[in-house]
Amino acid sequence: TGYNLSAGGPIVEPTARMTILTPISAHSLNGRSVVLSSEDQIEIEVMGHVQDGQSAVFDGDSYVTLEVGDRILVERSEIETILVKLNAGSFLDNLRSKLAGI
C-alpha cells in the first residue's frame, strides 16, 4: 500500500484480493491506476524500437534485458506471504493515524 500510494495509486485494504497497475513517472497527465481481479493475468509486450539497455526490474532485486517482441506475464503466485501484525489497531485506525497530518 505504501509504495502504491507514493506512486499516486489507491489505498487498498490488505485482505482485498486484487491486482493494481499504477504508472510510475508517467509521461501523460491522464495516467491512472487500473484495479483488476487477483485472478487476472497481465501480459506486457515490448513493441517498437527499444534502445540498448532496456530492462525490467522485479522487486528491485533481479532484472532482465528486453528486446522487441519479448513478453512478460504477470500473475498471482500460488505461494502466499504471511505478514506479522505488530499492533492491535485495525487497518483503518492505522491509516487514519498515519494520514492525520496530510
What are the roles of these predicted feature ranges?
Residues 3-4, 8-102:
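Catalytic phosphate-donor-binding core of small-molecule kinases
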